[in-house]
Amino acid sequence: MPRKGHIAKRDVLPDPVYNSKVVTKFINSIMEDGKKGVAQKICYEAFGLIAKRSGKEALEVFEEAMNNVMPLLEVKARRIGGATYQVPIEVRPERRQTLGIRWMLIAARKRGEKLMSERVAGELLDASNNTGAAVKKREDTHKMAEANKAFAHYRY
């Protein structure tokens, strides 16, 4: 907790190709060891593959995939009187986006394709069709929240 007040949130610049802040966040999440050029190459190659395979605009497929992966609810552990309850809570919009991107890339990294751009493209296409590991993660999270709906009154 900072003692000197609230720290202003830094705003990311939209990416140069698609002029989208979400794509910039996606690229920043792909990036490892500060190698942004490599991350951009992976992302834009994946978008090229998506456009080729689906015949649709890559950004449309990306946005549809993100909407299918972003969770609405999640559970948070809350300790009450010696018992720990999984309390379902709504997810804030910014966290929804962050979780969606994170789950998408975790699922992409676990895929079997040789190139990362192919993995990302495959996962985005699967997610836009409501299949794939990232969508399954979202469904599992929602099931957990649904199963623990009885503890919703312990909300934060």
From Swiss-Prot:
Q: Which family does it belong to?
A: Belongs to the universal ribosomal protein uS7 family.
- One cellular-component annotation, GO: small ribosomal subunit
- Which Pfam families does UniProt cross-reference here? Ribosomal_S7
- Keyword list, A-Z: Ribonucleoprotein, Ribosomal protein, RNA-binding, rRNA-binding, tRNA-binding
What name has this protein been given in UniProt? Small ribosomal subunit protein uS7
* CDD domains with a match to the protein in the record: uS7_Bacteria
Q: Which domain of life is it from?
A: Bacteria
Note the SUPFAM superfamilies from the entry.
Ribosomal protein S7 (SSF47973)
**How does this protein assemble?**
Part of the 30S ribosomal subunit. Contacts proteins S9 and S11.
Question: Matching InterPro entries, A to Z?
Answer: Ribosomal_uS7, Ribosomal_uS7_bac/org-type, Ribosomal_uS7_CS, Ribosomal_uS7_dom, Ribosomal_uS7_dom_sf
Q: Which molecular function GO terms apply here?
A: rRNA binding; structural constituent of ribosome; tRNA binding
What's this chain's function?
One of the primary rRNA binding proteins, it binds directly to 16S rRNA where it nucleates assembly of the head domain of the 30S subunit. Is located at the subunit interface close to the decoding center, probably blocks exit of the E-site tRNA.
GO terms for biological process, alphabetical: translation
